[in-house]
C-alpha cells in the first residue's frame, strides 16, 4: 500500500538576513571543563595533613575560609589553589557519619590571579549524596539550558592525597564568569537565595531566614539571614525588587525579567524540582541584576530534580509529589509573594502555562532521556562501582533511573517520576486547554504576516534592546487594512518599524490559552538586521517533529485522509493531508 503527503501549506520561519537567536552556543563545547563525554580525574593534594579537620571546623566557624592545595588535571599541576568544603545537608549527612565524601568548592584564582582550570576560575564538586544515579543534576541541566541561562554539569573522579575519594558531580559556579557568558557583563548585583541556617548546626547559631521575597521592612539588615550577597553591593537593589513584588511601588516588569522567571517556574514544575521557590522549600536559586536593570532568576542545585529525596516525605503517598499543584503559591496564605503576583496576573499565568506545555512536549521524551542517562552511566559505572564512599549500592545506581525506592529514606525514580508527572500535567484542566496555532511567519519589505488559528488576540512582541529584553507589544490585525490583505482570513499583519537589529516573537491568545512562536521565546526569538523580502523555507530534514494536532489544536496520532497540523521543534507548522 502506497500513500503520499499532500502538503497544503509549507510554513517558513527563517528569511535571508533573519535567524532564530540560539543561546545554546553559549554553553560549553566538546573538550571543555563540562564536556559530557569525558570522565576526567582531578587530584587534590594538601600540604597540611590535618586538612580535613581544619576544613570541617572552618565550615562551621568561618565558611569562606580556604586552605591551599595543588590540583592536577590532565598531567598539569596548578599551585596555590583555594579549597573549602561546601553544601548544607549534603555536607552534614556524610560528615556526621565520618564519611569523607563531602562537597568541595575549588577556587583556582584565590591566590594566583588569573589562574584557571580549562578556562574556569572556580568549580564546585557535589557529592550526589541524595542521588543514587549520579545523573539527576546532569539530566536536569540538559533540560533547563533550553529555556533560560543555567549552570552546566558533568561527572569527574576525585582523588585527595592520592586516594580515590569518589565520583563527583562537577557543577558550574554562578559567578562573574557565568554572568559574563550569559549576560555579556559581570558587574551587576548578585544574590544566592539561600537562608543562612545549617542542616547540622553544632555551633548553635540562629536559624536562617527564608528567601521567599517577602517584604520585611526598609531596614536591609532584616534580609541578611535569607539572602547571601555575592557582589560588592546590592542590598538596596534587592529591596527595590521586594518592594515591587509586595507593595507595587514600580511595575514588576521594570525590575524583574518576568519571562525568565516564568520559564524557571515552568521547568521546575515539569521536571519535579520541588526543592526551590515554587516547590516545597524556598531556596536554591540566584538573582542577578543585569544592565537592563532586570533581575534574572537562575536555577541552582538540581540534585533533587525528578522528585529526588523529596520523595522521602511522600513515599507512601506519592500523589503528593507526582500531582503537586503547578499553580501552588497563587494563594497569599502560602507565603510566596512572587508566585502570588505572577500566577494571579492573567497574561503571566497564560504565559507560564504555555511554557509548561512547551517543556512537556519538548523535553519529557523518556527514550531520549534514558539514552543520555545510559551513556553517562556507562561512562561512569566503574568509577561509581569503585567509589566506596558513595551512599548507595550499584543496584540502586541502576534501578533508581527507572523507579523510586525506600532505603533509609525515599528517593524518586527518574522515569517513574516523568511518567507520573507528565500524565498528571497533560490532564490538568488548565494545561490541557487548546492554545492557538501559529504558522507561516513571513516578512515582505516592512510587512510582517503570520497565520494563526483559534486566537482572539495576536501580538508582535518586539525589542531593539542589546540585552534581548523588555519586549513591547504591538497588536497584529486581521481586518483587511493597514497592510492586511484580507479580513478574517486567519492571516494577521503588522507594519514593522524601519530600523535594524529587530528582535521579535509572536504571542497569540484565546480566552483559554496562549501560544508563542518561537515556542522558547523570550529565550529564543526571531532576529534580523535588514528586511530582505519573503522568508525562505527551512531545511525540513533538520527539524524534529514535536507533535501532530487536529484542526481543533488537540494532539492526535497520524491518520489518513484528514487535516493534520505537524508542529516542529523550530516553531514551524505544516498543514497536511496524508492520502492513502
Task: Say what each PLM segment does.
Residues 1-19:
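Bacterial Sec-dependent N-terminal signal peptides
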Residues 18-134, 139:
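Conserved NTP-binding catalytic cores of kinases and kinase-like/nucleotidyltransferase enzymes
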Residues 19-23, 31-33, 37-39, 50, ...:
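Middle-to-C-terminal accessory/interaction subdomains
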Residues 67, 500-504, 562:
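Exposed beta-strand face motif in extracellular beta-rich ectodomains
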Residues 427-437, 529-555:
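Residue-level detector of functionally pivotal "anchor" positions at catalytic/ligand-binding pockets or at interdomain
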Amino acid at each position: 500500500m502506497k500513500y503520499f503527503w499532500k502538503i497544503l501549506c509549507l510554513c517558513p520561519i527563517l528569511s535571508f538576513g533573519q535567524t532564530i537567536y540560539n543561546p545554546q552556543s553559549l554553553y560549553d563545547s566538546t573538550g571543555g571543563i563540562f564536556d559530557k563525554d569525558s570522565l576526567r580525574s582531578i587530584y587534590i593534594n594538601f600540604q597540611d595533613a590535618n586538612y580535613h579537620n581544619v576544613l570541617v571546623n572552618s565550615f562551621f566557624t568561618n565558611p569562606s575560609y580556604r586552605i591551599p592545595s595543588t590540583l592536577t588535571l590532565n598531567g598539569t599541576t596548578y599551585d596555590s589553589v583555594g579549597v573549602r568544603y561546601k553544601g548544607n545537608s549534603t555536607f552534614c549527612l556524610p560528615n556526621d557519619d565520618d564519611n569523607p565524601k563531602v562537597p568541595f568548592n575549588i577556587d583556582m584564582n584565590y591566590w594566583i590571579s588569573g589562574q584557571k582550570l580549562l578556562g574556569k576560575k572556580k568549580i564546585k564538586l557535589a557529592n550526589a549524596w541524595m542521588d543514587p544515579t549520579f545523573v539527576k543534576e546532569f539530566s536536569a541541566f540538559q533540560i533547563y539550558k533550553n529555556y533560560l541561562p543555567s549552570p552546566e554539569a558533568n561527572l569527574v573522579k576525585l582523588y585527595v592525597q592520592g586516594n580515590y575519594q569518589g565520583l563527583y558531580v562537577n557543577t558550574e559556579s554562578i559567578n562573574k564568569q557565568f554572568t559574563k557568558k550569559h549576560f555579556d557583563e559581570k558587574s551587576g548585583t548578585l544574590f544566592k537565595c539561600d537562608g543562612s541556617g545549617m542542616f547540622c548546626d553544632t555551633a548553635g547559631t540562629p536559624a536562617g531566614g527564608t528567601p521567599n521575597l517577602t517584604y520585611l521592612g526598609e531596614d536591609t539588615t532584616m534580609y541578611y539571614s535569607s539572602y547571601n550577597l555575592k557582589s560588592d553591593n546590592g542590598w538596596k537593589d534587592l529591596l527595590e525588587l521586594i518592594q515591587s513584588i509586595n507593595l507595587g511601588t514600580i511595575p514588576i516588569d521594570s525590575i524583574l525579567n518576568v519571562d525568565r522567571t516564568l520559564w524557571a517556574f515552568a521547568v521546575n514544575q515539569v521536571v519535579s524540582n520541588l526543592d526551590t521557590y515554587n516547590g516545597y522549600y524556598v531556596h536554591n536559586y540566584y538573582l542577578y541584576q543585569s544592565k537592563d536593570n532586570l533581575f534574572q532568576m537562575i536555577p541552582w542545585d538540581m540534585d533533587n530534580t525528578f522528585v529526588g529525596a523529596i520523595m522521602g516525605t511522600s513515599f507512601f503517598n506519592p500523589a503528593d509529589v507526582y500531582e503537586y499543584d503547578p499553580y501552588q503559591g497563587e494563594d497569599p496564605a502560602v507565603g510566596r509573594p512572587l508566585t502570588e503576583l505572577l500566577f494571579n496576573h492573567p497574561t503571566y499565568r497564560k504565559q507560564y502555562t504555555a511554557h509548561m506545555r512547551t517543556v512537556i512536549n519538548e523535553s519529557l521524551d523518556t527514550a531520549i532521556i534514558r539514552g543520555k542517562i545510559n551513556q553517562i552511566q556507562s561512562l561512569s559505572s566503574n568509577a561509581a562501582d569503585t567509589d566506596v564512599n558513595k551512599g548507595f549500592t550499584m543496584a540502586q545506581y541502576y534501578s533508581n533511573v527507572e523507579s523510586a525506592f525506600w532505603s533509609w529514606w525515599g528517593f524518586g525514580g527518574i522515569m517513574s517520576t516523568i511518567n507520573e508527572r507528565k500524565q498528571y500535567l497533560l490532564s490538568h484542566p488548565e494545561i490541557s486547554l487548546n492554545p492557538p496555532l501559529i504558522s507561516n511567519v513571513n516578512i515582505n519589505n516592512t510587512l510582517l504576516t503570520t497565520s494563526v488559528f483559534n486566537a482572539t488576540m495576536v501580538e508582535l512582541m518586539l525589542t531593539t534592546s542589546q540585552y534581548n529584553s523588555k519586549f513591547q507589544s504591538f497588536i497584529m490585525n486581521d481586518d483587511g487594512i493597514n497592510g492586511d490583505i484580507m479580513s478574517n482570513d486567519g492571516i494577521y499583519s503588522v507594519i514593522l518599524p524601519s530600523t535594524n537589529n529587530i528582535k521579535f516573537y509572536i504571542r497569540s491568545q484565546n480566552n483559554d490559552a496562549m501560544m508563542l512562536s518561537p515556542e522558547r521565546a523570550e529565550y529564543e526569538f526571531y532576529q534580523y538586521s535588514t528586511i530582505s523580502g519573503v522568508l525562505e523555507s527551512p531545511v525540513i530534514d533538520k527539524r524534529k517533529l514535536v507533535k501532530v494536532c487536529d484542526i481543533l489544536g488537540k494532539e492526535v496520532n497520524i491518520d489518513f485522509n484528514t487535516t493534520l497540523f505537524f508542529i516542529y521543534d523550530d516553531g514551524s507548522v505544516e498543514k497536511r493531508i496524508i492520502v492513502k
